[in-house]
């Protein structure tokens, strides 16, 4: 075996340990990275505790992360505590990097959700918790920053029960900024016994039968309830002053359990890619089952591609070590595997967590280099960033030739701009950020362009029928033409032309929620080619779309607004101005809970407005819920070359008939 800074004794200890993969999650500025750094230091993985303010953190390794004090990319490190190896995934806390957060959910055995004792529950907090709850991921809630002035823990406890879950178990009490246990293996309060009985039928039966139940019995039941994501323990601390960190480590090693291995066959999931300063590609994999060995030859996905593992590392106590084998539930690092993409798997297809819906960006902007000769450099850099983060979608507009990037928000745009400048040495300018609208035909229409009928220059006849479909259906393509008459290559060319045409409608936005039927075709055998059909299709499609007209679709958000009762009138007025659809309002003496749908374009900044007018008490949580016909103003995205004389001639020809 080969080792780097690790002995054979350490390695054999490692492969016999229980291994868990833990996500560290939080809203921005809750102290997530600081908590992670304290876990590393307290466990002995680092010799000093990194500080965000000093820019010397282990997990935020990118220069921009250290400078801005936010996490951009999920990073993985490792600690050992109470005989358990814990791979820690420090994830972004900003909504603009939610895609990075979502990817980590696929590999978590448990999570620590960090709240700020001062700021309390934010919109991002509830979004994260709802996902953890939906996927039944065991979760510990850690209330950080209990040292801050003005902290009201009783109000926060009520907020947790109101906005997160009633199934929380407060494990400690806080006195003069210090934490003391009130629930352990040796002691449990009477009210907590009732809590456990209400969540476990076996304990309840023993309790009602006056059978002896020891504190250890209650404790083991709590462990089981947490492992099943039925109960969420709540702990307290201050990363700034290293308060409650050891207790958090104890809770992690007690409550988060490793999964049972179901097979000895290799199954590994690729969740992260990064490039080192020399450009070498580093791929991070979670070994779901079996093991990955040096010099193994393994299949990528279900394809015919095989790769040989020429180098292999894992993470041990905060550092990487070279090994010959990485076992089940551990993290493997493989370098210079060019065929790897995030989301790939090796060996048997893993049973990844189901029910996770990826949020697609609904904003876009054009980007151009300050120096036009550096355009190819920008494209190459964006491609590298896309390999590292597949949610970074960019394309070249087929009409304007502009580079367009889809975005989650302003912060992501600023991060991309800084990365291009500092990492790739190219300065760029972003145009105004736009909402991404879509288009849908209004009515069913049919359009035909005949072969050898001017101004048609192509050796093809094409007839297309367009008809609208229900919102959210997407694009459907059908053909009424027999393959015996027109073979696959010609028909595939038409289908390609349809897909290309749907990229830009009458207002420049993607055309969706429609069925396109290929209804008529004619060709001349000696001269017609698939290219004739491919190139004519967009003109037929465009003319049909003009005849139909289009509805403009705008992205919608499902929202939940939790505010003090005193602010409810203002909130309802605001929601009406934003053209929201209020579906439910429930109020009591203190709080008002409003649910509904609201356009993205009118509600971009409303979360910060809610926080402002409720003095931090209100929560505005949103998630994408598809598109609907817009009720308000919208912007065009027209990029078509106005000098397209052929389209003009087709339009003129059709209008004269």
UniProtKB/Swiss-Prot annotation:
The keyword GTP-binding applies. The gene is tetQ. Residues 17-260 form the tr-type G domain. GTP binds at residues 26-33, 90-94, 144-147. GO terms for molecular function: GTP binding; GTPase activity. Belongs to the TRAFAC class translation factor GTPase superfamily. Classic translation factor GTPase family. TetM/TetO subfamily. GO terms for biological process: response to antibiotic; ribosome disassembly; translation. It comes from the Bacteria. Pfam families: EFG_C (PF00679), EFG_III (PF14492), EFG_IV (PF03764), GTP_EFTU (PF00009). Abolishes the inhibitory effect of tetracycline on protein synthesis by non-covalently modifying ribosomes. Confers mild resistance to tetracycline when expressed in E.coli. Keywords: Antibiotic resistance, GTP-binding, Nucleotide-binding, Protein biosynthesis. This is Tetracycline resistance protein TetQ. The keyword Metal-binding does not apply.
